[in-house]
UniProtKB/Swiss-Prot annotation:
HAMAP family cross-referenced by the UniProt entry: ARENA_GPC
Protein name stated in the entry: Pre-glycoprotein polyprotein GP complex
Site description Cleavage, residues in chain: 58-59, 249-250
Gene Ontology cellular component terms for the protein in this record: host cell endoplasmic reticulum membrane; host cell Golgi membrane; host cell plasma membrane; membrane; viral envelope; virion membrane
Notes on the domains: The cytoplasmic domain of GP2 plays a role in ER location. It also contains a zinc-binding domain that allows SSP retention in the GPC complex by accepting a cysteine from SSP as the fourth ligand.
Topological region Cytoplasmic: 33, 443-482
Stretches that traverse the bilayer: 18-32, 34-53, 422-442
Glycosylated residues in this chain: 83, 95, 164, 176, 354, 362, 379, 384
One GO-annotated biological process of the protein: receptor-mediated endocytosis of virus by host cell
Annotated site residues (Important for GP-C-mediated membrane fusion) in this chain: 33
Amino acid sequence: MGQFISFMQEIPIFLQEALNIALVAVSLICIVKGLVNLYRCGLFQLMVFLVLAGRSCSEETFKIGMHTQFQEVSLSLSALLTNQSHELPMLCLANKTHLYLKSGRSSFKINIDSVTVLTRSADVFVHSPKLGSCFESDEEWVVAWWIEAIGHRWDQDPGLLCRNKTKTEGKLIQINISRADGNVHYGWRLKNGLDHIYRGREEPCFEGKQCLIKIQPEDWPTDCKADHTNTFRFLSRSQKSIAVGRTLKAFFSWSLTDPLGNEAPGGYCLEKWMLVASELKCFGTLQCQVQPKSRLRVCDMLRLFDYNKNAIKTLNEETKTRVNVLSHTINALISDNLLMKNKIRELMSVPYCNYTRFWYVNHTLSGQHSLPRCWMIRNNSYLNSSEFRNEWILESDFLISEMLSKEYSERQGRTPITLVDICFWSTEFFISTLFLHLIGFPTHEHIRGEGCPLPHRLNSMGGCRCGKYLPLKKPTIWHRRH
């Protein structure tokens, strides 16, 4: 878009060149002829026929009245099941026997068997939703929520057993749902809760046998997909609402600045900012000395920055001084070397330069000239111009070549590359549409020997494809024009 705007702004300038006018004329002719060829080839008419044919046979939407229509809308609930902390949980049933639970970055596996792992004497006995001794804070609320969702009541039902999270065996919680003696109603209630949130699971517990639920952290299996229906069942089983509180973290920041607010590593001001709002607090050298003891660390840090700043400044000054001394030494050596070379050439009668007289080639028509070159001396007298005739002839050739190259570059610069691209692609467009015009496309289909049944699309039996008209059993043919 920027290139096109620049091209439009430069139209009055580049139209001053005859070549640019020719390129514009060729581009316009090719575009116009290409559009004419594209229209005459029948491609547009064929596309319009294929799009509109048969539209009168059916409606796009089901209309109930004049201004009422039957429509639908779909919602994507995948955003509710994100992989962040304190989000809605996901449940999975793998192979009808393996139960899984996931919320945020924590995932768990639920096993139901008859093997006793935890005992009341060696492990932790819990009878409240506070499971801090069993799981981490991010996992504690998820497990407590799941236990309540399957029907456990902390104030009425038996307590649970869990392994201390500091043990190396791993985190684990055990629930006894054996339907025997006085535990039968409790076991049936938790079983119904499991059947509700894990639809289609197989029951591994049998009457009269011990049955235990074990919950332990485990990676979420790859074959488990996010299903919001399981989450809805889980939420419907919950007995209370959970409001998760969120706090802002790392919202404010501080930086060292000068009194004007510009960032400076050695500044004595602290700038507190939040997005665009800021607050500036400055500490001078004398103010630092009278600050309370709680702010001595801030003062020491500012003094350290000031010391480092002065050290860097001193190092830069010393470096500049040494570089200048080295440059003067090198220049002196070069000057001595040139003087010695000229003296040797004078002794050997070799032409040399004394840097007092120079020659150059001047182009009188354009006023341009070449770079000055030294006029050589031999035996204390300047050389005759005929003695270095080849040199100034070559210099004149170089000058003319440079002038021609510069003029060519200026002419090229006055022809925008966008105009060249337009001319090239318009020519390609014209050639392509010319072939399409020579080939030709059929524009519609109708019954042979009869009129055009537009906008209906016919089948091989001469009837409308949508079924509005009965098959006439007549041959059809494609025509190019109406």
